[in-house]
Amino acid sequence: MAADPTTGGGEAESFFRAAPPLRDQDRVAGDLADFVARHSGSGGGGRLAGVVCVTSGGTTVPLEQRCVRYIDNFSSGQRGAASTEYFLKAGYAVIFIYRRGSKQPYCRFLPEDSFLDLFELGEESDIQVPESHAAVVKTAIRNYRKAIDEGLLLKLPFTTIFEYLQLLQMVGTAMNCLGRQGMFYLAAAVSDFYVPWESMAKHKIESASGPLNMQLNQVPKMLFILRKQWAPSAFCVSFKLETDPDILLQKAEAALRKYGMNVVVANELANYKDVVVMVTSNGRTTVRRPSKEDDVEEQLIDLLVEMHSEHIMQLNQDVHKLT
């Protein structure tokens, strides 16, 4: 029987208790605390629009503790990388939780071939960027360095479902102090099933043993816990991807109610780059990519920024009424 997400965090607590410790956990916690402290109180009349946590890429489910084999989720990280760029452009500070090896902000337009194809040797064996790539490389470096140098981008990598959910918990609790200034934009493709760490084989599973039968557990639904416990005042956006268009919007609306999201972005695998549907308690809004040269994320982020601003302003209005 599937667990009811509204019954509390018992399954989540068991998941975290059994999970292998996050690598560099103390360093990550310190970086998070510094980043959030730097940007807390910057909203309202300040320059910063808010702080958003963008999750991107797919999680893996290891089948062995010393992992050789794993189950993967489809996601290139394109949406998360593009959205991060547009959030930065809109004046947000961004915590970017991303799958190692996935698309990165400002690198989406670089060639997908070997990294070495971006460079060539000059006459004196100095390294140069070919003219064909020079403009896009310069733009990528300029924009990326600006975000890093101004302290507006914090990147936190993951590979496994264990790493991802531990990072999400750490970021959620760290951003709680931001109140409504915080936003979560949960574009990562998160595994629905996993092998509990204590149930895994320690070493590589032997193929000589014959067919493999494996029991997978459901991953605890952390969206409800994020919304109700870790960062209850934040503006929360989740995504629903389906291959069957007949059930997509129905499932998106169910997720909106079930997990208390502010927005669920529904997208179909066949055309996810071209069109998405924003599902809210007030109805549906279809967002389309204007042309092949544009990103659907640009229009999507513009709408979400406006909604987040209204979310923040609502608190200010409530406070004003009390005073």
UniProtKB/Swiss-Prot annotation:
For this UniProt record, the keywords arranged alphabetically read as follows: Coenzyme A biosynthesis, Ligase
EC number of the protein: 6.3.2.5
Q: Name one GO molecular function term.
A: phosphopantothenate--cysteine ligase activity
The reply to whether Repeat figures as a keyword in the UniProt entry is: no
Question: Which top EC class applies here?
Answer: ligase
Q: In which pathway does it act?
A: Cofactor biosynthesis; coenzyme A biosynthesis; CoA from (R)-pantothenate: step 2/5
InterPro entries recorded = CoaB-like_sf, DNA/pantothenate-metab_flavo_C
- List the catalytic activities from the record: (R)-4'-phosphopantothenate + L-cysteine + CTP = N-[(R)-4-phosphopantothenoyl]-L-cysteine + CMP + diphosphate + H(+)
Q: What processes in GO biological process is this protein linked to?
A: coenzyme A biosynthetic process
UniProt superkingdom: Eukaryota
| Family per similarity comment | Belongs to the PPC synthetase family.
PANTHER family in alphabetical order: PHOSPHOPANTOTHENATE--CYSTEINE LIGASE 2 (PTHR36032:SF1)
Q: What role does this protein play?
A: Catalyzes the first step in the biosynthesis of coenzyme A from vitamin B5, where cysteine is conjugated to 4'-phosphopantothenate to form 4-phosphopantothenoylcysteine.
Subunit structure, interactors included: Homodimer.
Q: What is this protein called?
A: Phosphopantothenate--cysteine ligase 2
Its lineage reads: Eukaryota, Viridiplantae, Streptophyta, Embryophyta, Tracheophyta
